[in-house]
From Swiss-Prot:
GO terms for cellular component: cytosol. Residues 211-226, 316-325 have a biased composition (Basic residues). Modulates lysosomal sorting and functional down-regulation of a variety of G-protein coupled receptors. Targets receptors for degradation in lysosomes via its interaction with BECN2. GO terms for biological process: endosome to lysosome transport; G protein-coupled receptor catabolic process. Keywords: Cytoplasm, Phosphoprotein. The gene is Gprasp1. The modification Phosphothreonine is found at T860. Residues 461-484 have a biased composition (Polar residues). The lineage of its organism: Eukaryota, Metazoa, Chordata, Craniata, Vertebrata. It holds the Pfam family Arm_2. This is G-protein coupled receptor-associated sorting protein 1. Residues 21-33 have a biased composition (Low complexity). The modification Phosphoserine is found at S295, S619, S626, S862. Interacts with cytoplasmic tails of a variety of G-protein coupled receptors such as delta opioid receptor/OPRD1, beta-2 adrenergic receptor/ADRB2 and D4 dopamine receptor/DRD4 as well as D2 dopamine receptor/DRD2. Interacts with PER1. Interacts with BECN2; the interaction is direct.
Length: 1347
């Protein structure tokens, strides 16, 4: 990390103008004429353009804008850039925690290695450079550069992490040609490689950060994917400074670039820890310091990009801080200065803070001049960020620009500067990583690292991490990787770092895989948190590199250290680990980070998993270690998790926008999305705890990885929620608890084919090779009560502007060929297959309210001209449904266009309605514009529903898994331990209903009884005729309505069950007009003179009730109710039992009872299944037990009570066949008691039950043995209703028929003893008497059939 390391890049870096704040480059010991400012850390980024003309940096753009489109704007020879940069990057990186050698190897892949190196570089060469620049320098720089502020701050800013501060993480991607104004900025990141053209992020020069030139800073803050944006991001002052992301425009090394940042502590975090790569990043944040992302004006920051959750709004203003990582680092000391400096610019920055969104043109407006070219280079990604400011990028068509943004919060007014990077790659696609972290009081620092993938073959990976600090809110910005580390106050340490390493060549070769890891951690007040991440990457089949990083926050002053270890292995594997945790006090926010893009041979399959876990209490320790070594065929595994601290307070806004431009073949684009804050989150101290196994908490959305022979880029995003104390990054306002606001996030992205880019500026090659597969994954969640506001804000500044594509919201992902399988874990796996296939899936979840969500995705084939469209709609609101729709169109090829619109979220009941609308549309190439539309409205209740999940498999061997899920949050706050509402599983839409779970069956009749309450509509004109209690026999009614009378299932000769009461329309049913006339005629006639057997008369439906029935049918679409209505109208046939039930209940009362108790169908379905499904099964023990329970409960009810009548009706229905006769006959004594003691209605039901038993010869013998004949004669001799007497006569007639077959009695071997006891004499005499009575009844006029 010494200058030497930096040297190659340093020279370039030296380019930084001496005048730059970062001019401290001088401090850096620039080599040669190049004045390298440590701040600039140009060395690493040869491509970066220092303010000073970098001589060494061919790719760097000196302050003066170099015309070189190659990506070198600097006067320096562009030539050096590619090589130098990559090399340097690699070298620099090498010193860094990330393995240097690896990096150096990667160096070949300048971009990639460069990309990795940037992160490392912070520690290493860059760091060295930065080291050169002490905090003092930083201050000096800032001060010095206050004039140039805008321009220089970015540049100097990078290196600005003085060595004391820790080398600044401020290095970044390659330098990109920048107008001289920009040069120093670039120099910050200069990379030797133009291709590396990825800009790193950092806050502007610290000086600039510090300096008032917030505006320029602004540009910086808001880094955009696009170079132009990036350029814009640079302080405006430096119009030229645009080097932003786009620093190198080399077409070749695009992928190599990676942006990252890190903040330097006041003390050089880096240097102080180990200089070696391992020590690569440390952060110490001050408690007080607050880091903010500079994403635009504090308020305006509509951009998602910054967040900070400073406790104070001012923190927000400070966000500009990111201008200088140094700022950050030195800022500690100068926090306030930074604040000031930033504040001015901040506003502007805010907007640009991320994404290419144009945000406000204001950002970088000055830079525009030069930027424009940059922008151009970006191919019209139209970095659209305001930042893009029209920087013109002379990037090759294939160049891609990346922008990264992120945030951090610092507490208090201090601002920790955040770094944002903008990167543009000429040819390579850069990767952007975002993350956030918050510090407790202290600012949190986070660093992101990207790797960009090398050319067509290279793959980019981004990872995000975030941490939250105890008090500080955490915000995350999406995208650029940046690590800004506020100098920590002694009391607090914040650390965030992560990375992954990219192989030297990330070309996706069948055998190569890269691994990235990212993570964060936050420190609780004093608690130390440590997280370990292990990344492993295999450059070649034969090599395997592993990087490990982790950090922890030490108590107060502890520093976080990131360590990367590289290891080579014969096999390659990729591992990604994301996770986070939050400090105890601070809100724990979880973020998920998907970071992995593996390009492996067709056979390889990567797996990515994000997760979190939260710990209760203050301390959370999370360590993620994901290591995978695979044979060529093995698949990488990654596991993320995190712990949350109690009472985490975090706010998350994540936005990533990633637009890389690659060569035509390498048009792999990724689009990122961010979520706006105010995101939700658990405001509770509840910790989220999520383990891989159980995803108790939340949120893991994510990604996937692609396996392709070709390059791919991956972006990851995640979210978290902020607690009520948080400040909204964008607005700078304090975030209200979720109860107040709706949170919505989106996260987003997916990975597209190497060629395909989702939302990529260049859609150049959307189609992957035959075996390539695109996967897009996105998902969301709904914020709890909070309404999601950030989107709107984002919109406002970010605007992500028309050109940029911002995606907010949730969505989907599509797999090209592969199937997506949603894993409960939220993993999505897809393996590319030989053929292309795209699948899109989307889902949501919703807060506690019910959720209704529908998602629809359409994807069209991906060919060069293919266009993929994804749509997902989600909305959930309990009372007020929210609708969210995401629509995405992506076309490969230069002409491809992508449109993404999404919105969704739900808010809890308590949430106020929040409405945000973001529209982002981006078309690759010249005409790109991005519009993001984010509309959300949350009403009292939110309902989220997972609409769908797609599953596809691409390659035989390789698989990618992406999982998404959601959970519900509590009313007032986001639930720290949300429970997944659903698991997205691909299963046939027509999945059969599951049989009832025996363990859930009622143990007593009480569990099945349903008592209905009067419904609100009862007062609306349909009052029940009489109190109605839903009878238990309704189960059989429903069973009958949907499958015929359960019991009456007969097996025909062909062994096919034939329901005895099949439902069919009666061809002779009357029309409504005819029924009305008939009912009126009946009412006008005398009851004794009216005789009609039509269904209306049988059901005793009156004219008034019939009209109510028609209204109910018209107002309701419930099939149950329509079936009942059709029976009542004679349109459907029904069994006698069903007709009796409807008549006794009253058709309107029955329907209203059903309407009043929506869950009745669930309960009755259980009975229906028991009654209907049991007979076909040989084991009837369960049903027999149930029948016994009904009989016993019936006798226990009050005599003649409705419950008792309901039980008798059910038993009568169950005895319609002989299946349960042996069970019921054991209770004959009880039934005869009811026959003697009950009223007419009770006797009627008992007689019908006995009539059913008499049909069975064996039961007939039991009836005769129990002396039932005398009981029947008593009924005949006393005054009894004609209906009951007719039933008694029917019983006698049935018994008589059996007696006539006396042989049957003697043939029964089972009842020998009873045979002797049967005495037929009493029955014969009784029968003769009954015969006389029957004849008398027949003579009576108006005799009607028993009911």
């Amino acid at each position: 990390m010494t200058r030497a390391e930096v040297e190659p890049g340093a020279q370039a870096k030296a380019e930084n103008k001496p005048g730059d704040e970062n001019a401290n480059a001088a401090e850096v010991e620039p080599e040669a004429p190049l004045v390298v400012r440590p701040k600039v850390r140009t060395q690493i980024m040869t491509g970066a353009r220092p303010k000073v003309k970098p001589k060494g940096t061919p790719g760097a753009r000196p302050k003066g804008e170099t015309s070189t489109p190659g990506g070198a704007y600097a006067k320096c020879k562009p030539k050096a850039i590619p090589i130098a940069r990559s090399k340097h990057d690699a070298q620099v990186w090498a010193p860094n925690k990330f393995r240097g050698e690896s990096m150096s190897k990667m160096g070949k892949q300048c971009q990639i290695s460069a990309a990795d190196p940037p992160l490392l570089s912070n520690d290493s060469g860059m760091v060295a450079q930065a080291k050169c620049l002490p905090v003092d320098r930083e201050l000096a720089n800032m001060d010095t550069e206050s004039i140039p502020k805008k321009a220089n701050s970015p540049a100097g800013f990078q290196p600005s992490y003085g060595s004391e501060e820790g080398t600044n993480m401020g290095s970044w991607y390659r330098a990109r040609p920048v107008p001289k104004g920009e040069a120093y900025e670039n120099s910050d990141f200069k990379w030797a490689d133009k291709p590396s053209g990825s800009p790193s992020f950092w806050n502007r020069d610290e000086a600039s950060t510090r300096f008032r030139p917030r505006k320029s800073m602004k540009a910086n803050n808001r880094f955009r994917h696009m170079a132009k944006q990036e350029a814009n991001t640079m302080p405006r002052h430096k119009n030229k400074q645009e080097f932003y992301n786009i620093s190198s425009s080399d077409s070749e090394d695009e992928s190599g670039k990676t942006p990252w940042f890190w903040p330097k502590d006041k003390t050089k975090v880096w240097s102080k820890p180990k200089e070696e790569p391992n020590s690569r990043s440390w952060f110490r944040s001050k408690k007080e310091v607050r880091v903010e992302s500079t994403s635009g004006s504090e308020c305006e920051n509509p951009t998602k990009s910054l967040f900070w959750s400073g406790e104070e709004a001012k923190s927000r203003s400070k966000p500009r801080a990111r201008k200088g990582v140094n700022m950050r680092a030195r800022q500690q000391a100068k926090r306030e200065a930074c604040s000031d400096a930033m504040s001015g610019a901040i506003d502007t920055n805010k907007k640009e803070s991320w994404f290419l969104p144009e945000e406000k043109a204001n950002v970088f407006s000055k830079s525009k001049t030069k930027k424009e070219p940059r922008t151009r280079a970006v191919p019209k990604e139209e970095v659209k960020t305001k930042a893009r400011a029209s920087t013109k990028q002379e990037a090759r068509p294939e160049e891609e620009v990346l922008v990264g943004a992120w945030f951090w919060d610092t507490q208090e007014s201090t601002m920790a500067d955040r770094i944002s990077i903008k990167t543009t790659f000429v040819e390579e696609e850069p990767i952007v990583g975002d993350w956030f972290w918050s510090e407790e009081e202290a600012s949190v620092d986070s660093e992101t690292c990207h790797t960009s993938r090398p050319r067509a073959k290279e793959e980019q990976v981004s990872s995000f991490c975030l941490g939250s600090g105890k008090k500080s809110s955490m915000e995350s910005g999406p995208k650029a990787t940046s690590k800004s580390m506020p100098v920590a106050k002694e009391d607090e340490v914040v650390i965030g770092s992560w990375f992954w390493a990219d192989d030297e060549e990330i070309n996706l070769q069948a055998d190569d895989e890269s691994i990235f890891g990212s993570w964060f951690w936050g420190t609780g007040e004093n608690s130390l948190r440590s997280v370990g991440v292990n990344c492993e990457k295999m450059p070649k089949a034969g090599e395997k590199e592993v990087t490990d990083s982790w950090f922890w926050a030490g108590d107060v002053n502890t520093e976080a250290e990131v360590e990367e270890q590289a290891r080579s292995a014969s096999t390659k594997a990729t591992i990604f680990v994301p996770w986070f945790w939050s400090e105890k006090q601070p809100n724990m926010d979880l973020g998920s980070e998907p970071c992995s893009d593996i390009m492996a041979g067709a056979e390889e399959e990567p797996i990515i998993g994000p997760w979190f876990w939260a710990k209760v209490d203050n301390s959370v320790e999370a360590e993620v270690n994901s290591k995978s070594s695979l044979e060529d065929e093995e698949e990488p595994i990654r596991s993320p998790w995190f712990g949350a601290r109690e009472q985490t307070d975090m706010k998350y806004a994540a936005g990533i926008r990633y637009k890389p431009m690659a060569e035509a073949e390498d048009a792999n684009k990724k689009s990122c999305v961010w979520a706006k804050e105010p995101c939700l989150y658990p405001t509770n101290r509840e910790c989220l705890k999520s383990t891989l196994g159980e995803k108790e908490d939340t949120v893991d959305p994510w990604l996937w990885s692609n396996n392709y022979p070709r390059t791919k880029t991956i972006t990851g995003s995640w979210l978290w929620a902020a607690e009520e104390g948080n400040i909204d990054d964008e607005t700078g306002e304090k975030i209200k608890l979720p109860t107040l606001e709706d949170n919505a996030f989106n996260s987003w992205f997916w990975k597209e084919n190497e060629e395909s880019i989702v939302e990529a500026p260049k859609r150049e090659e959307f189609r992957p090779e035959a075996e390539e597969e695109d996967i897009i994954g996105s998902w969301f969640w709904a914020g709890d009560e909070d309404r999601f506001e950030p989107a709107a804000k984002i919109n406002e500044e970010n605007k992500i502007a028309s050109e940029d594509e911002d995606t907010v919201g949730s969505w989907f992902w599509g797999n090209e060929e592969a199937s997506l399988e949603a894993v409960r874990r939220g993993t999505f796996e897809s393996a590319p297959g030989i053929k292309e296939e795209k699948v899109t899936g989307s889902w949501f979840w919703t807060d506690k309210a019910k959720v209704g969500a529908g998602s629809q995705t359409v994807e069209t084939g991906s060919e060069t001209e293919e266009e993929a469209i994804f749509e997902s709609l989600i909305w959930a609101a309990k009372k007020d449904s929210i609708q969210a729709g995401v629509k995405r169109v992506s076309k490969p090829k230069d002409d491809g266009n992508i449109a993404v619109g999404s919105w969704l979220w739900s808010s809890d009941k308590a949430t106020k309605e929040a409405k945000t609308l973001i529209v982002s549309e981006a078309s690759p190439e010249n005409g790109k514009e991005s519009v993001v539309k984010f509309g959300s409205r949350a009403k009292d209740e939110v309902i989220n529903k997972t609409g769908s999940g797609d599953n596809c498999k691409h390659s035989t061997e390789a698989e990618t898994i992406v999982g998404a899920w959601f959970w519900e949050g509590d009313e007032a706050s986001f639930e720290s331990n949300p429970v997944p509402v659903c698991k997205a599983v691909c299963e046939p839409e027509s999945s059969a209903e599951h049989e009832p779970d025996p363990s859930r069956r009622p143990q007593s009749w009480d569990e099945v009884t349903v008592q209905f309450k009067a419904g609100p509509w009862g007062k609306a004109g349909f009052p029940p005729m009489n109190p109605f209690r839903f009878p238990k026999e309704a189960a059989s009614l429903f069973a009958e309505m949907f499958g015929g009378k359960p019991k009456l299932v007969e097996v025909g000769p062909e062994r096919e069950p034939e329901p005895q009461f099949p439902f069919q329309y009666d061809p002779s049913y009357r029309s409504v007009r005819e029924i009305r006339e008939h009912l009126k005629a009946r009412e006008s006639a005398q009851p004794e003179n009216w005789s009609c057997n039509c269904i209306q008369c049988e059901l005793r439906i009156g004219s008034e009730e019939f009209e109510e029935l028609l209204l109910l049918m018209d107002r309701n679409r419930d099939p149950f109710i329509h079936e009942i209505s059709k029976i009542a109208m004679g349109m459907r046939g029904a069994s006698q039992f069903t007709r009796d039930f409807i008549r006794n209940s009253g058709v309107v009362s029955l329907i209203e009872a059903l309407l009043n108790y929506p869950s009745s169908r669930v309960r009755t379905r259980f009975l229906e299944n028991m009654v209907r499904m049991a007979p076909p099964y040989p084991d009837l023990n369960m049903i027999e037990t149930y029948v016994c329970q009904i009989c016993e409960d019936t006798f226990d009810y009050d005599l003649d009570s409705p419950d008792q009548l309901s039980g008798l009706t059910m038993i009568t229905h169950l005895t319609a066949t002989s299946d349960y006769h042996k069970v019921v006959v054991n209770y004959l004594a009880g039934f005869f008691y009811l026959l003697n003691s009950g009223n007419t209605k009770t006797r009627f039901h008992v007689l019908k039950l006995l009539l059913n038993l008499s049909e069975n010869l064996v039961m007939t013998k039991r009836l005769l043995v129990t002396d039932s004949v005398s009981e029947f004669m008593d009924l005949i001799n006393r005054e009894e209703s004609d209906e009951n007497i007719q039933i008694v006569l029917a019983i006698f007639e049935t018994i008589s028929k059996h007696i006539q077959k006396e042989a049957l009695f003697s043939d029964d071997d089972d009842d020998d003893e009873e045979e002797d006891a049967v005495n037929l004499e009493p029955f014969i005499s009784a029968f003769r008497e009954a015969e006389k009575i029957a004849k008398e009844l027949k003579r009576k006029p108006g005799n009607q059939k028993a009911p």
